[in-house]
Amino acid sequence: MSKITNEQVKHVAHLARLEITEEEATKFSAQLEAILNFADQLEEVDTEGVEPTFHVLDLQNVLREDVAETSLTQEEILKNAAHTEDGQFKVPSILGGGE
């Protein structure tokens, strides 16, 4: 496994629109490398003859019944919002430049 560089960590952080320090990049680089090394170890485990497991527990579709309930009106929801426009929340752009 090749080493995860600080530059790679910074690039991923940039794509996620996260600002990280050089110290954090170094820390995350080491953590990511440890995770990938562990994944490599898992790949080496002999699973010949082991049945695939799709569900650890023998439960399927354990969901609550979908029941419609009364909820807040649009006015009630928007009344505490700092900014609204055309009946919707208006928030600052985080992507910038139309990205």
From Swiss-Prot:
Its EC number is 6.3.5.-. One of its GO terms (biological process) is translation. The keyword Protein biosynthesis applies. It catalyses: L-glutamyl-tRNA(Gln) + L-glutamine + ATP + H2O = L-glutaminyl-tRNA(Gln) + L-glutamate + ADP + phosphate + H(+); L-aspartyl-tRNA(Asn) + L-glutamine + ATP + H2O = L-asparaginyl-tRNA(Asn) + L-glutamate + ADP + phosphate + 2 H(+). Keywords: ATP-binding, Ligase, Nucleotide-binding, Protein biosynthesis. Disulfide bonds: none annotated. GO terms for molecular function: asparaginyl-tRNA synthase (glutamine-hydrolyzing) activity; ATP binding; glutaminyl-tRNA synthase (glutamine-hydrolyzing) activity. It is an enzyme of class 6 (ligase). InterPro entries: Asp/Glu-ADT_sf_sub_c, GatC. Gene3D superfamilies: Glu-tRNAGln amidotransferase C subunit, N-terminal domain. The keyword Nucleotide-binding applies. Pfam families: GatC. Allows the formation of correctly charged Asn-tRNA(Asn) or Gln-tRNA(Gln) through the transamidation of misacylated Asp-tRNA(Asn) or Glu-tRNA(Gln) in organisms which lack either or both of asparaginyl-tRNA or glutaminyl-tRNA synthetases. The reaction takes place in the presence of glutamine and ATP through an activated phospho-Asp-tRNA(Asn) or phospho-Glu-tRNA(Gln). Heterotrimer of A, B and C subunits. Belongs to the GatC family. PANTHER family: GLUTAMYL-TRNA(GLN) AMIDOTRANSFERASE SUBUNIT C, MITOCHONDRIAL. This is Aspartyl/glutamyl-tRNA(Asn/Gln) amidotransferase subunit C. It comes from Macrococcus caseolyticus (strain JCSC5402) (Macrococcoides caseolyticum). The lineage of its organism: Bacteria, Bacillati, Bacillota, Bacilli, Bacillales. The gene is gatC.
